[in-house]
Every structure is written in C-alpha cells, then in structure tokens.
Amino acid sequence: MLKKLTMLFILAAGLFLLLPPLSERYSITSVFRVTEEPVAITRGTYGSVLTVNISFGDDEVMDWIQALDKPYPTLFIDTDWAERFPETIDLIINKNIPTALLGQEGEVYEYDTELFINQLERFETLFGVKPLWFRTADEVFPVILHELLREAEVNALGSSLTWSGGDIPPVTEGEIISVPHHRTNRVQLLELNRLSESREFQTIEDVIFGTTGKMKKLPK
C-alpha cells in the first residue's frame, strides 16, 4: 500500500510540473467574474487606483505613455480612438500597460444591444485579449448592459471619484479615481504628476481584493 501511495504521489507531482504556468496577462483574475450579482464596482478595500479614460489625443497621449513607469494606471480605451492610433496601441501592448474597454453613455446600450458586442470584438482584435473591465462614458450601467456584461464575463467598473484637475482630493482607502481625457473634457496628462505625488497607486485587483505589494508613484 505504501509503495502504491508513493507512486501515485510521484505521478501527481510529475503531472503538476508539466502543466504550463499562467502568464501574468492571463492571470486567474482574468477568467473569473469579481462579483456574483450584476453590480458596478465603485470602491475597493485598500489603497488607491488610478484609471484614465481615453477617447481623444495623439502626440500628447503617446508621449505620456512613453514616460509611464510601473505600476501603471489602467487605461480605459475607446475603440474608435484606438483604431485611429495603432502605433500608440502597439506601445501600450509592448509596455504591458493594463487596459480596459471604455464605452459610450449608458443610455445608448438600452437601444442598441449590439453595440457592446461590437466594441468588445474590436477591443479583442486590437489587444488580442478580452477586457476584464468595462466602463461607460458616464458610468451609468442599465440593466440590459449588466446582462450583456455577465454573459461576456466582463466586470462593470465605475469610480468613487472623478478628478478633472484643480485641487488634489484627500486620500480615501479603496478609492477608484477616474480621470477623463476626451475632446471636450480632459485633464492635461502631465497634470497627473500632481495627483501621483499625493498618494501611491496600486492595481485595480490589489485595491479591490485588499492585497498589498510594492508601490511606486508615476514619474514626474
């Protein structure tokens, strides 16, 4: 009996070692929904996370991305914008900067249920991976959109604070900060240096799940 158990243990250990490890890009958090109920996450449990919504910009965005250092903010990307600037998208991919899908205003999805699927497919074509996170432009998530998100196994992420420049807000544990960069509403990306000097940013997963790790401010 002891000999059989020993052989089974050796066989199991060998099979485990032969299994390929999950890469960082396809971590366990990328294949499971964060919440069981259809709800938009607007706050975590620990630290601060920076998210930047991008639907406008050319050279300024490229220069800012080139200067970014880890840990990176999560970039919520509008697919119409992304398709116009493939070189910027290549840079984002090469630097392995976290990305997510930025949609239109929430009300639009009540009348056009195909829109989200179209945006999702275009995002996958651009980045080669399905986004874990989705945000509408106004952070409004209609019921039908929640259903589409659950079917696609994509999480709805709002924010606890939108920063449009000006005074630096006080730090709140678990905060998810959203910064706009649109044609009619945008923060000069270099202004984010002031925000980064006021707190230390973590990843979305770290803030939501309350894990800790090395933290580093964005470059000046």
Which sequence ranges carry the predicted segments?
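N-terminal pre-catalytic segment of deacetylase/amide-hydrolase enzymes
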Residues: 1-51, 56-67, 200-220
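Extended aliphatic helical segments
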Residues: 31-34, 39, 49-52, 61, ...
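Aromatic/hydrophobic pocket-lining residues that form the small-molecule binding cavity
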Residues: 61, 85, 116, 188-192
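Glycine-rich, phosphate-binding/catalytic loops in enzymes
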Residues: 67-68, 152, 194-195
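Metal-dependent polysaccharide deacetylase catalytic core of the NodB/CE4 family, i.e.
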Residues: 70-183
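Catalytic grooves of carbohydrate-active enzymes
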Residues: 171-210
